Amino acid sequence: IKLFLSDETIDKFRGIEQTVNAPAINKTDANKTAVNKKEQSLAIVYEDDEVLVVNKASGMLSQKAKKEDRSLVEYITDYLMTRQQQQDSVFRPGICNRLDRNTTGLIVAGKTVESLQYLNRLFKERELHKYYLCIVKGCIAQKETIDGYLQKEEKSNKVTIQKAKKEGSVRILTAYEPLEYGRYQKEEYTLLKVDLITGKSHQIRAHLQSIGHPLIGDH
């Protein structure tokens, strides 16, 4: 899944982007050098004493898939450790939402036990909403909520969408609203704002493709 965000949209979320710059360091300090290199991958959108919001880069894992992986969680932990915000605490920051590896977008992290628990509750109870911007093939003229059932094949990690419930399938709901429409090389495209009412693997791409509007790059 690819997430396409305009500069204007990003600016609305973050005000002025803060990109973490590595401070001057002693060249003989290999550990600090490694940490500073990791810091450069963090684009901080918002930060206070309790919360950190970053714009995850494409290609970066939200969380480890394997023990040897370096994910956004490790980058955030290193960033806070270098600023002595977590050195005297057994608590390590955690993220409250995840994005696919190739998806760019905002991820929220709690810097304290209390803030992490509070933010997780907001996400779980849908008091805090996540929206995705994506470009799809074809013209979509009006906003709509679509319903269906998602069937996942675990071995191949592929999903199919059906209108009726089958054994092993789960119900999905996807709401979308068209924001812009245009043409490119005689093809029609629509920029959508998507709200995952249910959040399942590959839901956006599979559900939109099932109604004849695949994400660009998927057709």
Label each region the model flagged:
Residues I1-H219:
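RNA pseudouridine synthases
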